[in-house]
């Protein structure tokens, strides 16, 4: 049933609340009829295209259908509403990496080759521009004549620093620029400074060698002798005082007297015993010796005729 047009629609009235279910049913029926018409319309067109010549439509098959439609009146138009199921989109985006049928792989290769050629051309242009750029040449060194150097040296001895006016005047006289005169004076002052430094270094001489550290033993500490420390520096070997005995005669084969008792000593006068031959004590460290007949005391290899030469046995030098 469809609501009558005479009724007023108030959203908060009791009738509208009660008739809400009926309105929803009518909307659902209208939506269903619209869908059926949309789906059946192509089928009816197809049937009309293939119908036989003797078929004139549903009115000819049912003669009372037109009168029934006239009595019922025109069917109400269904309300427009959005479909329950949205229609599928007509365009699907192509996923990344899917092959494009419209593109040919040969076209991709051609594009890649064109890009590579463009990059190579750009690189060649940049290299050519860098090569064409002229290098900055160094200014040639200014060579002064002997007259100019002589005049500059003479002025430098008089005045080491010049004012701008004096510098311009000297440059005009020497036919130089003010900058050249300025740089020459700067270099000359630096040269004098280096010469003074070298002379000072020559006068000072070479630097002294670094001090060497020598270990010295500590013998006394706080007024007390360091016995423990000095024992470590004792000599590695000891010297005895009585390494040799001096009381023993070095030649035991000979007697105590220089002259043999078999020969006589009458030819020479005897000296006083107290002056020349003191008595030797047993505890004396020195060895006494006597001189007898020099002719009779001879060495085994010498003849007896040599009376002036004799050997003195038992003499020690102290």
Curated annotation (Swiss-Prot):
The keyword Nucleus applies. It is found in: Nucleus. SUPFAM superfamilies: Homeodomain-like (SSF46689). The keyword Phosphoprotein does not apply. GO terms for cellular component: cytoplasm; Nkx-2.5 complex; nucleus; protein-containing complex; protein-DNA complex; RNA polymerase II transcription regulator complex; transcription regulator complex. GO terms for biological process: adult heart development; apoptotic process; apoptotic process involved in heart morphogenesis; atrial cardiac muscle tissue development; atrial septum morphogenesis; atrioventricular node cell development; atrioventricular node cell fate commitment; atrioventricular node development. Residues 137-196 bind DNA. The homeobox domain binds to double-stranded DNA. Transcription factor required for the development of the heart and the spleen. During heart development, acts as a transcriptional activator of NPPA/ANF in cooperation with GATA4. May cooperate with TBX2 to negatively modulate expression of NPPA/ANF in the atrioventricular canal. Binds to the core DNA motif of NPPA promoter. Together with PBX1, required for spleen development through a mechanism that involves CDKN2B repression. Positively regulates transcription of genes such as COL3A1 and MMP2, resulting in increased pulmonary endothelial fibrosis in response to hypoxia. Belongs to the NK-2 homeobox family. Homodimer (via the homeobox); binds DNA as homodimer. Interacts (via the homeobox) with TBX5 (via the T-box); this complex binds DNA. Interacts with HIPK1 and HIPK2, but not HIPK3. Interacts with the C-terminal zinc finger of GATA4 through its homeobox domain. Also interacts with JARID2 which represses its ability to activate transcription of ANF. Interacts with FBLIM1. Interacts with TBX18. Interacts with histone methyltransferase NSD2 (via HMG box). Interacts with NEDD9. Interacts with TBX1. This is Homeobox protein Nkx-2.5. The gene is Nkx2-5.
């Amino acid at each position: 049933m469809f609501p009558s047009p005479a009724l007023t629609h108030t959203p908060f009235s009791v009738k509208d609340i009660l008739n809400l279910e009926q309105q929803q049913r009518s909307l659902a029926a209208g939506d269903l009829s619209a869908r059926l018409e949309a789906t059946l319309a192509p089928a009816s067109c197809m049937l009309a295209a293939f119908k036989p010549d003797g078929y004139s439509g549903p009115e000819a098959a049912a003669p009372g259908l037109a009168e029934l439609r006239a009595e019922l009146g025109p069917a109400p138009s269904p309300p427009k509403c959005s479909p329950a199921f949205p229609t599928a989109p007509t365009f699907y985006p192509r996923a990344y990496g899917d092959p494009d049928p419209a593109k040919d792989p040969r076209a991709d290769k051609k594009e890649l080759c064109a890009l590579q050629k463009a990059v190579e051309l750009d690189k060649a242009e940049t290299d050519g521009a860098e090569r064409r750029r002229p290098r900055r040449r160094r200014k040639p060194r200014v060579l002064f004549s002997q007259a100019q150097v002589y005049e500059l040296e003479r002025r430098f001895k008089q005045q080491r620093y010049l004012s701008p006016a004096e510098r311009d005047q000297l440059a005009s006289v020497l036919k130089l620029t003010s900058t050249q005169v300025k740089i020459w004076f700067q270099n000359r002052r630096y040269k004098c400074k280096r010469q003074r430094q070298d002379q000072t270094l020559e006068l000072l001489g070479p630097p002294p060698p670094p001090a060497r550290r020598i270990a010295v033993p500590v013998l006394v500490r706080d007024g007390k002798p360091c016995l423990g420390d000095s024992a470590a520096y004792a000599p590695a070997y000891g010297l005895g005082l009585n390494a040799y005995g001096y009381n023993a005669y070095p030649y035991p084969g000979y007697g105590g007297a220089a002259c043999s008792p078999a020969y006589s000593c009458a030819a020479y006068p005897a000296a006083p015993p107290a002056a020349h031959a003191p008595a030797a004590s047993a505890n004396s460290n020195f060895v006494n010796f006597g001189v007898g007949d020099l002719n009779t005391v001879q060495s085994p290899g010498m003849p007896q005729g040599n009376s002036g030469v004799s050997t003195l046995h038992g003499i020690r030098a102290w």
